[in-house]
């Protein structure tokens, strides 16, 4: 199997895993921390907004089965790409959305997708999700991995209570909520 990586942030990483897990070609989705300057940060350190890291997921995929463009299609249906100050009721640096590109192809695809969404006018405000070069990814603690499976009731309550589920449904229907 050929493999590539997509590293994406869209607020709380608990809500960024499930939408990707059932798609063909996606081999794994790992919650973690990306983009900062601290080595091997903990959840508590990242939450202080002093590590430079954001909560993110790193997706391992087979490019012979799915494309980075398909992953971006899913990604943009999981969060509010018009808000760069956090996501829903999670505010601050560690919850900012970011696309971390691994190569020139990913950068171009991300720029094109942003432009396309802005031209389509799906959102009332412009899509402003930053596109940055990938520099690091540190897996989060085990209790954060596959949170939606380990804690389904809390996951559902969090999604609903944060406003994420309502936002996604209002823009995209039930497909990723």
Swiss-Prot record:
<dbReference type="GO" id="GO:0036211">
    <property type="term" value="P:protein modification process"/>
</dbReference>
<protein>
    <recommendedName>
        <fullName>Peptide methionine sulfoxide reductase MsrA 2</fullName>
        <ecNumber>1.8.4.11</ecNumber>
    </recommendedName>
</protein>
<dbReference type="InterPro" id="IPR002569">
    <property type="entry name" value="Met_Sox_Rdtase_MsrA_dom"/>
</dbReference>
<dbReference type="GO" id="GO:0008113">
    <property type="term" value="F:peptide-methionine (S)-S-oxide reductase activity"/>
</dbReference>
<comment type="similarity">
    <text>Belongs to the MsrA Met sulfoxide reductase family.</text>
</comment>
<keyword id="KW-0560">Oxidoreductase</keyword>
<comment type="function">
    <text>Has an important function as a repair enzyme for proteins that have been inactivated by oxidation. Catalyzes the reversible oxidation-reduction of methionine sulfoxide in proteins to methionine.</text>
</comment>
<feature type="active site">
    <location>
        <position position="12"/>
    </location>
</feature>
<dbReference type="Pfam" id="PF01625">
    <property type="entry name" value="PMSR"/>
</dbReference>
<dbReference type="GO" id="GO:0033744">
    <property type="term" value="F:L-methionine:thioredoxin-disulfide S-oxidoreductase activity"/>
</dbReference>
<dbReference type="InterPro" id="IPR036509">
    <property type="entry name" value="Met_Sox_Rdtase_MsrA_sf"/>
</dbReference>
